[in-house]
């Protein structure tokens, strides 16, 4: 089913088909297990972001904003769309109407079959060399601000960030973590109380853990 979802064109489908899909995806939620993060401030969690029960998870999207079209690809964009259901691509398409997302921009959708209430989709910079430019560093910081702007406008209280741009977009992991933590720390939050830095790789966990617990110049223990 997932492979078919990944190549599905965003158009209306029958209620019966949606119901069948939703039953299957909700069963997958039960099998994977739902993770609820307690407490406020900045927190680090390693695991599958599609398990998190928060107000919003952040998706590292591409400029088209419609998810990954490669069947069964393991990028976070594909994983989130596959777990949410075909409704997610439809809503993204309805919002964008063929327009491309700018680097640093974000849009927010419902979470559908995810434990998260919403998905915030943002496009990070693509790095062609090992060293990002100052402009690209600024674009990555803008991704985090754009996501927080949408969360604040909607009155959300919790948000989980993936490691934006560090996957197939090749942003250096350590510098990306510094920018993420610094941007979140300096953002004037009001409604958002809990920010989760979600990582999937051991090396990202080690980087974030070090910055958050050992006093990196760009980090705060409590974001």
Which stretches of residues belong to each language-model region?
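Macrodomain-like recognition of ADP-ribose-binding/processing modules
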Residues: 1-223
């Amino acid at each position: 089913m997932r492979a078919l979802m990944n190549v599905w064109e965003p158009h209306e489908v029958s209620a019966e088909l949606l119901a069948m899909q939703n039953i299957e995806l909700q069963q997958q939620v039960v099998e994977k297990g739902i993770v609820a993060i307690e407490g406020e401030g900045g927190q680090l969690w390693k695991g599958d972001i599609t398990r998190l029960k928060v107000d919003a998870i952040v998706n590292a999207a591409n400029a088209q904003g419609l998810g990954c079209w490669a069947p069964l690809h393991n990028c976070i964009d594909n994983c989130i769309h596959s777990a949410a259901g075909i409704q997610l691509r439809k809503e993204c398409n309805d919002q964008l109407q063929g327009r491309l997302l700018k680097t640093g921009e974000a849009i927010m959708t419902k979470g559908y079959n995810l434990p998260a209430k919403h998905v915030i989709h943002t496009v990070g910079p693509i790095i062609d060399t090992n060293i990002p430019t100052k402009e690209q560093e600024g674009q990555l910081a803008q991704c985090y601000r754009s996501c927080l702007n949408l969360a604040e406008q909607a009155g959300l209280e919790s948000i989980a960030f993936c490691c934006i741009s560090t996957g197939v977009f090749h942003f250096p992991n350590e510098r990306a973590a510094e920018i993420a933590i610094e941007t979140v720390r300096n953002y004037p939050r009001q409604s958002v109380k809990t920010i989760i830095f979600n990582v999937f790789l051991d090396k990202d966990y080690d980087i974030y853990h070090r910055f958050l617990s050992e006093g990196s110049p760009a980090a705060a223990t409590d974001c």
